[in-house]
Amino acid sequence: MRKALFLSILFFLFLNPFFSQEIVHTEDLIAVELEELEKEKGFTEDEDLEELVTEEPPASLEDKEEKIPHHSLPGIPDEILQRPDVEKFRQQYLSEKWSKLLYQYLEDAMEYRLYVRKAIQEKEMPAILEYLPVVESNYKTNAKSRSGAIGMWQFMANSVWPFLTLNDFVDERLDPWKSTEGALKKLNDNYNYFQDWLLAIAAYNCGVGAMTKCLKKAQEKNYWYLVDHNLLPSQTAHYVPKLLAIADLAMNSKYYGIELPDHEQEFKELINERDGNFDYLEVNKAYSITQLAQEMRIDEDSLKHLNPSFILGMTHPTKKSQIRLPLGMKEPAQEAIKKLTPIEFPFKYTVVAGDSLWSISRRYGVTVQAICDLNNIKENAILKIGKVLYIPKK
């Protein structure tokens, strides 16, 4: 019989006042941008896209001056980059508003973006994948979509296994390093299945099962055939064109006359987060990240920044956890952990019909506020049947 785990709530809250991280809620980025683009340009149908290109010819690959060469995207024919659906997104990001936003996304994401670039090169995967997190989340590590996808790579809860860990204490979707490894593994699995990178990327959006069904209806095993014959979900049909447009602009910013950061110099001198080179401390009990930082005499926020997957601000109470540390800090962490007392965690209660925070608090002899503080919920929260609550020790 498993031994029950208990927590002294006052002690825990005093030492760990922040045990959940803020989530940036994002809408469906492609849908929102298409809506804005339609309002600004006044088009809604595919024929309007062609009219846009006809009325205001873009700086096409042929029309540009020879002195600024256009660099082809590896594995992507130039004629693909001139498709109207790719051009639509390219024109969007060439506008003053969106070019500034794209610059900001890429600049703010430098630490993680360079790690993604390094990982892609090491795995010999397509260079355009560096820009997939822009499509997914604008490189926001704590992004959350309306559909429930979370993190820089927007994993759904039902699609994390076997790539990432997700439980009551750990959500690796919020970890930019682990989620990058998980996303690239998933993309590589998709490629091994479809033997086509554009299909693999599109399947990352709609799922392998959905893509397989679409291909069964197609006469050609080709992403653009699926797009041109309206065999894909709308979002997936726009997914790859947006990625190609962003990658083209980022890799040819001078050609298109816009300023975008490439961070080539920083990539030559990878350090810390950019390199993904850390020390780790393995534990198998619940330890407060705040307490550990204080005992090590290092900045608490910095240690939490390296360990965003610990959603309650502490390691798992019964399973092995790896605490990510700045390089060279493993020995100080080992000494510090010896001085800490593992947190006694409370037992779990599953909400049933008729429950309220007040009735649960009365049943277990604790205050409503104590339950709310421990579970990071408000006193007026509506409890859903099946929700798991942690009940603090009296």
Regions found by a protein language model. Give the residues of each.
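Sec-dependent N-terminal signal peptides
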Residues: 4-14
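Sec/Tat signal peptide C-region and signal peptidase I cleavage site
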Residues: 16-20
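An acidic, Gly/Ser/Thr/Pro-rich helix-cap/linker signature
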Residues: 21-124
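Extracytoplasmic/secreted proteins, especially bacterial periplasmic and envelope-associated proteins
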Residues: 88, 104, 108-111, 115, ...
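Substrate-binding clefts and substrate-entry loops adjacent to catalytic sites
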Residues: 90-104, 139-146, 153-195, 215-230, ...
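Short, functionally critical alpha-helical segments immediately adjacent to catalytic or ligand/cofactor-binding
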Residues: 125-142, 200-205, 303-307, 374-375, ...
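Primarily a LysM-type cell-wall glycan-binding module
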Residues: 265-300, 341-367, 378, 383-389
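Extracellular LysM carbohydrate-binding repeats and other cell-envelope/extracellular binding modules
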Residues: 302-339, 367-394
